[in-house]
A protein has these predicted regions:
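Catalytic core of the SET domain in histone-lysine N-methyltransferases
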Residues: 1-10, 50-125
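Short aromatic-glycine motifs in intrinsically disordered, low-complexity regions
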Residues: 8-19
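Tight coil/turn sites that cap or link beta-strands
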Residues: 23-26, 112
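Polybasic, lysine-enriched low-complexity intrinsically disordered terminal tails
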Residues: 25, 82, 139-143
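Acidic glycine-/aspartate-rich tracts in secreted/extracellular proteins
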Residues: 34-36, 81
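Short, compositionally biased
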Residues: 37-52, 126-143
């Protein structure tokens, strides 16, 4: 698959994942790769106050792409997240196949389009909590 990284169309999202060729619905776009970690390490890392690129494969296995910027799948953004733009919707899903995760097209995707994938409600709930916590800490610092 011919994919490239450039500025996302979503405000504040940073970089995004784009395709240079048309992708058919149900095609595997790219494997989500990173460091493979166990459940206890997953729980430890989710308590940290930094960006997260964690994908929970199953009860005892997780992929963490935080320190693997060379793997392009981590740059796929969620069009249904905190920052949304009218007319932009997710066009792919995460799907697991054994111990691997792939981003799979949920519709035909045109050449030049950004790849958007659902991060899940629990991810965004966690992000909102973290943002509230940071805001509260910043407010208390000012006092």
């Amino acid at each position: 698959m011919a994919l490239l990284i450039k500025k996302s169309r979503l405000p504040g999202a940073g970089k995004g994942l784009y395709t240079t060729k048309a992708i058919r619905k149900d095609a595997r776009i790219i494997e989500y790769r990173g460091e493979i970690i166990g459940n206890s390490e997953y729980r430890r890392r989710t308590r940290r106050e930094e960006d997260q690129y964690l994908f929970y494969l199953r009860r005892d296995l997780c992929i963490d792409a935080l320190h693997t910027p060379q793997y392009k799948a981590r740059y796929a953004n969620d069009a249904a997240g905190i920052t949304r733009m009218k007319g932009i919707r997710n066009n792919s899903d995460y799907m697991t196949f054994g111990d691997k995760c792939f981003i799979v097209a949920s519709r035909d995707i045109k050449a030049g389009e950004e790849i958007f994938v659902n991060y899940t409600k629990s991810y965004w709930d966690s992000m909102r909590k973290r943002m509230k916590k940071r805001k509260k800490a910043a407010t208390q610092k000012k006092r």
